[in-house]
Structures are given as C-alpha cells and as structure tokens.
C-alpha cells in the first residue's frame, strides 16, 4: 500500500465485508459498494477472517489482486463465509454472531535467510513441489510462537513435514499485513 489505511477506511472495509457476507448468505448474490477513495481502489491482496465465539470460522484471501481493494474485500468475505473447505457455509442464523478481521497484504518477498523473518511483523508463505501453505503474521503472535515454530506450522498448513522448509527446493516468502478487525461482540 502507498500508505496505511486510516480509521474511516478500515471501518468502511469492515462494513463492506460484513454487508457482502449478509447479502451472500441471504441471496447468494455478489455485493459491490463502489468507493471513490484512492486507497480503497488500490490493487492489494487481502485475507478476510471470520470468527465465531472467538474461534476461526473461515479465512480466505489472495496475495495479489487485479480488483480494487474494496471489491477484493467483498469477494474474500463472501468466500470466507461460503467456500472455506474447513467449515460449513455460514447460515442465516449465524449472521448476528460473527466478527471480522481483514489483513491487507504487502507484496510477497522471497527470503533465503530465515533470520529475516520477524515474528509479529511477517507472515510466511511456503512452496515446495505442489504444496503451498500460508500463515498470516497475527497467527504466530496469537499462539506465542517463535520463528522455528512458525515455520514448522506453516509447513503443516501446506501438508508438508515440519522440516520441509529446510529443503533446497522449498521456497519461503514473507509479507507484512495491515490487520484490523471489529470489536468482539457477545
């Protein structure tokens, strides 16, 4: 991003994500709310995370996008609600009991030196053969992981052995994210 999102822009994206989920669950239709703000029209990757009762309920995103950020957020919100294969799709009765978190991503940067990975700042994306796995920066912080554990858990997410990141044919990428979310509701 050219600059950090301000509080109003963050609230706007959270509102777009929430409305996209509601429209998607209730009608199956896409939701688009055109925006004029320059930062909301930039092409950035993002992930939208849905939590219910403090537990992960869906998380889908892209590292890069051909769409303006506001459209990408709406699409990833609907995908998180309906297409995360780890969870059943949100239903109408779920619509008053979920919280959102949005991660707006920097471009991926390949790293050869794991000492460059800063827990709490970087997310990790690992590729090896046909396997891929990603963990967002906040995951390591939430679980109080060190760098080694973060790498091992990213390998597990990719379906790889925990030491796969050490292989010569494994590619490790880092990225940062501007992460913001809704207040937790009861």
Give the location of each predicted region.
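Basic nucleic-acid-binding interfaces
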Residues: 1-186
């Amino acid at each position: 991003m050219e600059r950090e999102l301000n509080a109003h822009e963050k609230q706007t994206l959270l509102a777009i994500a929430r409305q996209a989920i509601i429209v998607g669950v209730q009608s199956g239709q896409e939701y688009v709310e055109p925006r004029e703000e320059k930062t909301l029209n930039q092409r950035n990757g993002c992930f939208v995370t849905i939590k219910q009762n403090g537990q992960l309920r869906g998380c889908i995103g892209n590292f890069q996008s051909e769409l303006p950020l506001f459209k990408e957020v709406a699409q990833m919100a609907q995908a998180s609600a309906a297409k995360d294969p780890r969870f059943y799709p949100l239903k109408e009765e779920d619509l008053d009991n979920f919280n959102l978190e949005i991660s707006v991503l920097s471009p991926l940067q390949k790293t050869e030196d794991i000492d460059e990975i800063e827990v709490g700042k970087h997310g990790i994306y690992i590729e090896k053969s046909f396997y891929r796995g990603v963990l967002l920066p906040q995951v390591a912080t939430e679980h109080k992981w060190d760098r080694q554990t973060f790498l091992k858990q990213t390998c597990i997410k990719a379906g790889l052995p925990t030491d796969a990141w050490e292989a010569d044919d494994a590619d490790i990428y880092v990225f940062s994210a501007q992460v913001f979310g809704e207040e937790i509701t009861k």
